Regions:
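Juxtamembrane interface elements at the cytosolic ends of transmembrane helices
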Residues: 30-31, 132-136, 249-273, 300-311, ...
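Interfacial loop/helix-cap signal at membrane boundaries in integral membrane proteins
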Residues: 33-34, 72-114, 224-232, 302-319, ...
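Membrane-core helix-loop-helix motifs of multi-pass transport proteins
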Residues: 39, 43, 170-266, 453-455, ...
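Hydrophobic core segments of alpha-helical transmembrane domains in multi-pass membrane transport
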Residues: 52-67, 117-125, 156-158, 196-200, ...
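Hydrophobic alpha-helical transmembrane segments of multi-pass integral membrane proteins
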Residues: 117-119, 145-176, 181, 367-373, ...
Length: 528
């Protein structure tokens, strides 16, 4: 990790030429002016925690207004199997104020995404701290033939999201080094890696920490609307696995046919030292790979036979709902421990605990966000505003015949636009899910499909949003190789990826929709 972090250290240089270039770009280009407006507008937005606090306050006030208006909504409750009429419940009366105070702790501790993320991060923290993730990415990229290097960099970027944000820190700087070692433009390597890591954030061949996190928020939204339906963390798996292949192809095409030709030959004076995987890391990777194979074999024995340990009445549904997150943790923890022991980065149990503790410490911001988000979601549940909005909205959309695939495509575009201003995937979904998941459900679209559409929109515009949390880091990496690079330059570099990924990924969903293929082990499109 230290080697990779060293790569992103900036050179000392005179900033006058760079500032002039950036200012000229922003003044002379309509696109630059647009980017400037996006940057200014986005910078005026408060922190996501503050946004949730304001939203919670709005729910409290609106609940009182709608309660006083006495607006009823009648709908068919599938759980009760009867027509139900509901009214808004106020939070500004004695009972409501008591609920706000008495439920605050329980709202937080029972918030479904909280436990799933923290448990998974225990394993990820050990794997990252031991150096397993860093060594794996270096081995994957540095051992690739020249003709496949672009595809492998994009693929490695996509796969890195199983370790949450490690790809931003490790792979993006590494992309520049690898491309330069092949005599290619380092900014093209940064762009390819950044596109894979960020624009392909939701795609992967295997399940990562994002899957249970978003599924937990989806289930919270369903519970808040009193909908008797549970989405599994694997609900989008098949589609996201195939998406990985599509995005690698699209990323390769954009890099080699659009971005790199536009960049031209690299004339900078910067040079890089060759990066290698040490002998200790090689031994550690072999041992970690063997341990992962043994763990996978044991896991398959526990789920495949008819009387398998994790099957209840011959079914894996309960395991997929309750037991998958600990398996994800072990998927990282076991090879992480083995790698660390063999490579020498873990000398005792204290080192492993230190790595896990460091991962937990990094989740402090998420814990604060989860607390306020859980209050907002539960206020929606208590006041019935979520149900009122979902039912009335679905009836409106149905009355104008705006349903099915057109609605899903429109939702992808909405999610992509909102992502320009709110960077956190979980924060956005916690805001949008209580409204759109029940609304789509009432229009016979499954929560799996709604969440899938959100993930496409959320991922594809990450790379052109200055508010994305790692955007400043990427700017720093780019400036190391091109002192005249400004914010608009980086976004214009990444815009082709964003547009083509959004179009291509949406087209894949359309084709998938019409073929009727399942989007996951239990992922249908339409409710029966």
């Amino acid at each position: 990790m230290a080697v990779c972090l060293a790569i992103i250290q900036t050179n000392h240089y005179s900033g006058g030429d760079r500032m002039n270039a950036v200012q000229a770009e922003k003044k002379d280009s309509r696109f630059g002016r647009f980017l400037n407006a996006v940057e200014r507008g986005g910078n005026k937005l408060p922190h996501p925690v503050t946004i949730f606090l304001w939203l919670s306050l709005i729910v409290i006030i609106v609940s009182e207004i709608v309660y006083r208006l006495g607006v009823p909504i009648t709908y068919y409750d599938a759980k009760a199997e009867e027509q139900v009429t509901i009214f808004a419940v106020s939070l500004l009366n004695l009972d409501g104020l008591r609920y706000i105070v008495h439920s605050a702790t329980n709202n937080f501790t029972s918030f479904a995404p909280l436990g799933t993320v923290l448990v998974a991060m225990l394993g990820v923290g050990v794997a990252e701290g031991s150096g397993l993730i860093d060594a794996t990415l270096k081995k994957l990229v540095l051992g690739t033939p020249k003709s496949l290097i672009t595809a492998v960099v994009v693929f490695a970027g996509i796969m890195s999201n199983i370790a949450s944000d490690a790809g931003y820190i490790v792979l993006v700087p590494l992309g520049a080094v690898v491309f330069m070692s092949f005599g290619r433009h380092p900014l093209a390597g940064i762009a390819a890696a950044f596109a894979g890591v960020s624009a392909g954030f939701s795609a992967n061949l295997v399940l990562g920490t994002t899957d249970p996190l978003l599924a937990g928020i989806t289930n919270e939204a369903l519970r808040a609307a009193s909908i008797d339906y549970t989405m599994e963390a694997t609900g989008n798996w098949w589609f996201m696995a195939v998406s990985t292949i599509l995005l690698v192809i699209l990323g390769w095409y954009v890099t080699e046919k659009i971005v790199e030709p536009r960049l031209g030959e690299y004339k900078g004076s910067h040079t890089v030292e060759a990066m290698t995987v040490s002998d200790a890391e090689k031994k550690g990777l072999k041992a970690a790979g063997l341990s992962l194979l043994l763990f996978t074999a044991l896991f398959l024995v526990c789920i495949i036979p008819e009387n398998a340990v994790f099957k209840v009445d011959g079914d894996l549904k309960q395991f997929l709902h309750d037991g998958l997150v600990p398996i994800i943790m072990l998927f990282f923890l076991i090879p992480g421990l083995v790698f660390g022991k063999v490579a020498g980065t873990i000398k005792s149990d204290k080192d492993a605990v230190k790595f896990a503790s460091k991962a937990m410490a990094s989740m402090g911001g998420y814990l604060v966000l989860a607390f306020v988000a859980s209050q907002f979601v539960n206020y929606f549940n208590y006041t019935k505003l979520g149900t009122l909005l979902a039912v009335s909205g679905s009836k409106l959309l149905e009355s104008i015949h705006f349903t099915g695939l057109p609605l899903i495509v429109a939702f992808i575009i909405v999610a992509a636009f909102i992502n320009l201003f709110i960077g956190s995937a979980s924060a956005k979904w916690a805001i949008m899910a209580p409204i759109f998941v029940p609304m789509m459900y009432n229009l016979h679209l499954t929560p799996e499909l709604t969440q899938l559409a959100y993930r496409i929109g959320d991922s594809t515009t990450n790379i052109i949003s200055p508010l994305m949390s790692y955007f400043a880091l990427i700017v720093t990496v780019v400036e190391k190789y091109d002192e005249d690079t400004g914010l608009g330059t980086l976004i214009s570099l990444m815009l082709p990826y964003s547009m083509i990924f959004l179009i291509g990924w949406t087209l894949l969903l359309i084709v998938w929709y019409f073929t009727g293929l399942p989007i996951g082990p239990h992922g249908a499109y339409m409710l029966m």
